[in-house]
Amino acid sequence: MTFIEEFIYKGYLNQCTDLARLSAITQEAKIAAYIGFDCTATSLHIGSLMQIMILRLLQKHGHTPIVIIGGGTSKIGDPAGKDVTRKALTQEDIKRNAEGIKKSLSKFIKFGKDQGDAIILDNAEWLDSLNYLDFLRDFGSYFSVNRMLTMDSVKLRLDRSHHLSFLELNYMLLQSYDFYYLSKNYNCILQLGGSDQWGNIVIGADLIRKISGKEVFGMTTPLLTTASGAKMGKTAAGAVWLNEDLLSPYDYYQYWRNCEDADVMRFAKLYSELDIVELNKFESLVSEDINAAKKQLAYELTKLCHGERLAKLALETAVKIFEQGDIDENLHTFILAPEILQSGISAYNLFYNANLARSKSEARKIIRGKGAKINDQLVEDENMTIDTNFLRNRKVIKLSVGKKRHILVKV
């Protein structure tokens, strides 16, 4: 399959400025294409995984992926997809977040200076030195305010009478300038992004066409939700982060292992690197044994993010817990000060402190609803005292909420 054929087959396509022309060009020559990530957190989460897989797909087909870390644009904040103004980030926040995002991306993308290697850039390199008056003089006349106000990212805020600052309105100008800069200096002809980026991408393509007459393209991916309508990347317990310092490989594995039945085949197409033959076999497995398919999906995606060794460890840990009823030391752990356990702590307090409940009242509710276990034994009394007598021979206490959330308490 060609790059565009595989892009469509995997379910990545939402809109394209000229799909037929882009398909022809990518078959005739190798191109450079870019995706940007703003520095809003210390790690990317699975909400960005489709964009990351597209970067891998570009690399697979011999094209050059360019990753833009938004060290400059993060100082403003993209209004796209937001009802309220984003909280301003400090320079220290942006720098720390940029390093974390580079770590996330390096798990999936090969960066370097060899042919086919991805390029990573920080738009602060050119935006920080941009003179405002010069920018207005040289580029201001190319932007239509009338058109900017019709873009969904702006129009939705205005229609709801929500605040939209002049600062945020400038974001699409700077993103457009990014595309222009990459087109001029890296011969980049394609910008990719989520569906909420369509307006920004089109304005950038128009800017390049007006200034240089160069043919460039924009392509967006669909907004993804789970089969039940939940937003990708978020769970009741928090975001599904790609960096292991924020989410353990075991918990990452468990997220995919516990996905809805209706999502299994779709996720395999979107997020795995199984080829067509393997996907056809996997589709048969989904029909025959959904749990076996979920285990394979979770293993494949964890291997891609965390490597084969940690993926196998996560799989083995899950088998021991769910199929053999054993305690495994590789479970996520919570360290409790020895003096607390020596003097005793109430059951609901322990579950709350171990982050198995968002509040003490929720911990009480879980126990009252018979959803909590200690060392695989149902907790009947929320106020029961947990002390050193509950430590098992490996000096741990196993806490469980429902069938799928487990943690080891160590002292």
From Swiss-Prot:
A motif ('HIGH' region) lies at residues 39-48. The keyword Cytoplasm applies. One of its GO terms (cellular component) is cytosol. A motif ('KMSKS' region) lies at residues 231-235. The keyword RNA-binding applies. Its EC number is 6.1.1.1. It catalyses: tRNA(Tyr) + L-tyrosine + ATP = L-tyrosyl-tRNA(Tyr) + AMP + diphosphate + H(+). L-tyrosine binds at residues 34, 171, 175. It comes from the Bacteria. CDD domains: S4, TyrRS_core. Residues 345-411 form the S4 RNA-binding domain. Its main location: cytoplasm. ATP binds at residue 234. InterPro entries: aa-tRNA-synth_Ic, Rossmann-like_a/b/a_fold, S4_RNA-bd_sf, Tyr-tRNA-ligase, Tyr-tRNA-ligase_bac-type, Tyr-tRNA-ligase_bac_1. Keywords: Aminoacyl-tRNA synthetase, ATP-binding, Cytoplasm, Ligase, Nucleotide-binding, Protein biosynthesis, RNA-binding. It is found in: Cytoplasm. It holds the Pfam family tRNA-synt_1b. Belongs to the class-I aminoacyl-tRNA synthetase family. TyrS type 1 subfamily. Homodimer. NCBIfam families: tyrS. This is Tyrosine--tRNA ligase. It comes from Rickettsia prowazekii (strain Madrid E). The gene is tyrS.
